[in-house]
Amino acid sequence: MSLKIPEHVAIIMDGNGRWARKRGLPRIAGHYKGAEVAEDIVEFAIELGIKHLTLFAFSTENWNRPKGEVEALFELLRRYLQTKKDKLYKLGIRVRFIGRRDRINKELVKLMQEIEEESKKFKNLFLNLAVDYGGRDDILRAVKKAVKLQREEITEELFSSLLDLSCSPDPDLLIRTAGEKRISNFLLWNLAYTELYFSETLWPDFSREEFLKALEDFSRRKRKFGRVLDE
C-alpha cells in the first residue's frame, strides 16, 4: 500500500500527566517529555512532506488546572521557544500561534510575535501552535468580527477567513493520543471533513512508528466529502 501524505495534520497531544503519574513523577515531567516528542514529530513531518502541522498545546479550559501547573506549562513553552527557535528557523519552519493572547504573559506574547515575524519567510512546514485555544472561543471571536460586515457579504469562505486557522487548509487528519475519543473543543469549524484517528499511546510514548500507523490508516480511507464514490 502506498502511503498517502496528508497536507495538514492536527494533533491533540494527550496523556502527559498520566505518563508521569505511572512513573511516580510530577505531572510537569510528562509535559517536558511530551515537548521532546513534539519536536521529533515536527522534524518527521518535514521528512514526510507534510506541509501543515497543528499542535494543541494549551486549551482555554486548561486554565482550570492548578495554578502551579499552568505556570509551569507556560514556563515550559517560553523555555522551549527561546531555546529552539533557531533550530526551527534552520529547519525552514514558519511558526504561527492560534488562540487568545490577552490572558498570556506579555513577555511570552512578545516572544511569540517575534518568532512569527522572523519565521514568516520559511515554507518547509507551517507549524501552528494552539495556545489558549478553544474551538468555541475561536468561532465566537469570528462572529464578533462578522457582525461588523454586511449580512450579504458573509459567506462560508469569508467566515473561515476570520478564524484563527485561516492561513492553513482544513486538517486532513486529526490524531488524538492516550485513548480518549473526543475532539475536546479543538478546531470545531475546521474539522468538518477531517479524518479522525485515535491512538491508545500516551503522548510521551508516541513515536515515528506510531505516527506512521496513523498515516497508514489514513491512506486506507476513502474521503467522500458528501459525494458518492464508486466502490
From Swiss-Prot:
The active site is at D14, N62 (proton acceptor). Coiled coil: none annotated. The keyword Magnesium applies. Substrate binds at residues 15-19, 27, 31, 59-61, 63, 65, 176, 182-184. Its EC number is 2.5.1.-. Mg(2+) binds at D14, E195. Catalyzes the condensation of isopentenyl diphosphate (IPP) with allylic pyrophosphates generating different type of terpenoids. HAMAP family: ISPT (MF_01139). PANTHER family: DEHYDRODOLICHYL DIPHOSPHATE SYNTHASE 2, DEHYDRODOLICHYL DIPHOSPHATE SYNTHASE FAMILY MEMBER. This is Isoprenyl transferase. The gene is uppS.
